[in-house]
Structures are given as structure tokens and as C-alpha cells.
Amino acid sequence: MAKELTLSIIKPDAVAKSVIGEIYTRFEKAGLDIVAAKMTQLSREQAENFYDIHRARPFFKDLVDFMISGPVMIQVLKGENAVAKNREIMGATNPKEAAPGTIRADFADSIDANAVHGSDSLENAAREIAFFFEPHELCNR
């Protein structure tokens, strides 16, 4: 089976808790290789453009405000069924509904400050990866 790529963002709440290393360990234990990574402070424009699909939703402004509230860690993960595997280890969007042992169950504070973002499809993964990374920034592993 071909290996997939997916985008993951460790959000400002989790970066502030200094759990990047613990989250990376979970990716690697799940068989997901980190093939690109960067820490950055998103601008309002970047956050608005990245989450443009949610622009008409009532939570859009709060989401953007949260995503620019501190640095984020952005990575590209590669592995068998990477999109589904990453979403499984992230857990449900609402940490109160997330299975024990998932990233959100262990590190998220609320449905808004929910520690991580992960692509929800191969199509969105390709779009999201291209938003943050140039092709030459992805390493072969």
C-alpha cells in the first residue's frame, strides 16, 4: 500500500504546554514519519486563508484569534493510511468525547483549544501541505 502524506498542526495551547515532544513520540509510535516541520507564528491573514472553508461559520473569528494567539508547530506526516491514522491518534474534536490515550484527551483544554489540527482527507492534506510547505521542503524518509 502506498504511503500517504498528511498535515498536522500543534496548536498554540499545546505548544504553550511544552508537549511537542510527547506528541511527536505518538506520531512516530503510530508509524508516522515527520518529513517536514516548522515552528511559526501565524499572521491573521495566514490563519484566515488557511481556515477559509470555515469563514461563514459562527466560530471563524474565535478560531482565527486562537490560532494567532501563540506559535504553532506545523508538520507533514508520512505513513500507511497517514490521514486516518493521524485522525485516530488525535481523537475527537471535542476532548470530552476523545478516547482515553488520544492527543486531545490528554492535552486539549476545550473544543476550541483542542491541541492539534489534522487533515481530514487526502485532497485537503495536499492543499494544506502546499499552503505551508514548498515541495523541496519535504524530505524523503
UniProtKB/Swiss-Prot annotation:
Reactions catalysed according to its record = a 2'-deoxyribonucleoside 5'-diphosphate + ATP = a 2'-deoxyribonucleoside 5'-triphosphate + ADP; a ribonucleoside 5'-diphosphate + ATP = a ribonucleoside 5'-triphosphate + ADP
Q: Which UniProt keywords apply?
A: ATP-binding, Cytoplasm, Kinase, Magnesium, Metal-binding, Nucleotide metabolism, Nucleotide-binding, Phosphoprotein, Transferase
**What GO cellular-component annotations does this UniProt entry give?**
cytoplasm
**SUPFAM superfamilies xref list:** Nucleoside diphosphate kinase, NDK
- Identify which top EC class this enzyme belongs to: transferase
Key word ATP-binding present: yes
Entry-linked InterPro entries? NDK-like_dom, NDK-like_dom_sf, Nucleoside_diP_kinase, Nucleoside_diP_kinase_AS
Under Enzyme Commission nomenclature, its number is: 2.7.4.6
Cellular location(s) = Cytoplasm
Q: Required cofactors, per record?
A: Mg(2+)
UniProt-annotated binding residues for ATP: 11, 59, 87, 93, 104, 114
One matching Pfam family: NDK
What are the protein's GO molecular function terms?
ATP binding; metal ion binding; nucleoside diphosphate kinase activity
Which GO terms fall under biological process for this protein?
Answer: CTP biosynthetic process; GTP biosynthetic process; UTP biosynthetic process
Q: Which residues form the active site?
A: 117 (pros-phosphohistidine intermediate)
> Main subcellular localization, coarse class?
cytoplasm
Q: List the disulfide bonds.
A: none
Instruction: Tell me which HAMAP family the record gives.
Output: NDP_kinase
Q: Give the record's subunit note.
A: Homotetramer.
Summarizing the function annotation, the protein's role is: Major role in the synthesis of nucleoside triphosphates other than ATP. The ATP gamma phosphate is transferred to the NDP beta phosphate via a ping-pong mechanism, using a phosphorylated active-site intermediate.
Q: Which family does it belong to?
A: Belongs to the NDK family.
Name of the molecule in the record: Nucleoside diphosphate kinase
Task: Name the source organism.
Answer: Legionella pneumophila (strain Corby)
